[in-house]
Amino acid sequence: MAATAIEPSSSISFTSSHLSNPSPVVTTYHSAANLEELSSNLEQLLTNPDCDYTDAEIIIEEEANPVSVHRCVLAARSKFFLDLFKKDKDSSEKKPKYQMKDLLPYGNVGREAFLHFLSYIYTGRLKPFPIEVSTCVDSVCAHDSCKPAIDFAVELMYASFVFQIPDLVSSFQRKLRNYVEKSLVENVLPILLVAFHCDLTQLLDQCIERVARSDLDRFCIEKELPLEVLEKIKQLRVKSVNIPEVEDKSIERTGKVLKALDSDDVELVKLLLTESDITLDQANGLHYAVAYSDPKVVTQVLDLDMADVNFRNSRGYTVLHIAAMRREPTIIIPLIQKGANASDFTFDGRSAVNICRRLTRPKDYHTKTSRKEPSKYRLCIDILEREIRRNPLVSGDTPTCSHSMPEDLQMRLLYLEKRVGLAQLFFPAEANVAMDVANVEGTSECTGLLTPPPSNDTTENLGKVDLNETPYVQTKRMLTRMKALMKTVETGRRYFPSCYEVLDKYMDQYMDEEIPDMSYPEKGTVKERRQKRMRYNELKNDVKKAYSKDKVARSCLSSSSPASSLREALENPT
């Protein structure tokens, strides 16, 4: 009897006044707990393969696998889906299929955004945005207003509005309003478009005002935005300066050139430029073609040789900056081949590779094609990074007052550190003379990477900063260091051109950790040490041959030691 007294009863007595009249706090707690459990159970329908009792499929363009859904859940939560499924109620098809593009009258909703939307539909809970599709691959970005974050919120807004979920519309409208003032004006355009299509008046007015007071040129606005919005922006711009809009001849001529580009008529472009006093640069024709034309048309425009590939438009963007925004390798490569400078910065301190990173989602960066090749977005970043590494001496207009050291500035500095370290390894006397002349020692406290020759973990050292040092001082110090190293490398190119070419050949492998670091030859297994020595000796032989070639070429110098000969040449340049 005593044993049964301590066991929980299998039935609940309702005679107790405490149980029959529970307090409001207890009732609320149990209700919340029950709702939480219900929400979790419904989520299993989406995430657990064992609970796959779906009865319809949504096919999203370019996605191999459709998204399976339960019509009863969607119909209960959304009037749009209720009306949609009513039409097919008598259909003989067991699992009807719906194309996302047919459901949306405007805009786009990708797979990840739709799954995020469905998660709310099933559970009633709005989760944080998934990092792999709502952030960028720029390591110094806060991801509070970068393009992937905006695009994901815009897609969710289209889904929420079209599929008639008012509470989500309100939530995402607040989020998008926060983005408008934080983001670059070109990133505001997709927000403006979703506000226009979804009748979000407050958000639309905010976007129009932001674009109107920006320096975004009229031809870009005409290309991107609906006529109704365009007229409002024009009116606001006229009011802000109190000057009536005048259609001057240069704008008219520019418009004709750009319309010819819109029709892919490069011959007409050439004719218009020949017959008028406007140039392709003045019309920003190459910028426009790179932004909007087919890559083949861009190549044809480049072949006219009528434009400066490093010309800046009124906003400070070079053609390569615009190409980085488009992220099309078949446009970026011809521009670089024509001499576009990958190291040029915008007025606010962004380079082409930095722009490209801020537009690229981690998912797109890491995804490979069916043939196991990198995605075209990663390819664009790789091309631009390699170009910066290949031409580190072309510094562009490097900013000196950035709030954080730009990632491509770190990359160039790392490249130069490793290159000078490699030169020290093979001809220390000559390298030390060149470094003395460039006053590298005076900047060595920046990183301390040159002795011993840098290994491949130097990025960690580059990241170590003095917490008491302001961002301005830190960036300025790094630039001083970089300029000294650039001068050292330039000296090597001038006096040892063959050695310079050999180092060029091996630097990409060195940066990718394919060349052994001989600072620690004892590291690794016996086989690894043997391979390391063989690889090192192969490189050493190539450098020796190149050095002998340079020595013969400079036989006119003094027959004294190589270091003194170089020093004399540096101190008394002819």
Curated annotation (Swiss-Prot):
Keywords: ANK repeat, Hypersensitive response, Metal-binding, Nucleus, Phosphoprotein, Plant defense, Repeat, Ubl conjugation pathway, Zinc, Zinc-finger. SMART domains: ANK (SM00248), BTB (SM00225). GO terms for biological process: defense response to bacterium; defense response to fungus; plant-type hypersensitive response; protein ubiquitination; regulation of jasmonic acid mediated signaling pathway; regulation of salicylic acid mediated signaling pathway; regulation of systemic acquired resistance; response to bacterium. PROSITE patterns: ANK_REP_REGION (PS50297), ANK_REPEAT (PS50088), BTB (PS50097), ZF_C2HC_NPR (PS52046). Changing residue 500 to S: Normal salicylic acid (SA) binding. Changing residue 489 to A: Impaired salicylic acid (SA) binding. Interacts with NPR1 in the absence of SA, and lost ability of SA to repress this interaction. Residues 54-130 form the BTB domain. GO terms for cellular component: nucleus. This is Regulatory protein NPR4. It comes from Arabidopsis thaliana (Mouse-ear cress).
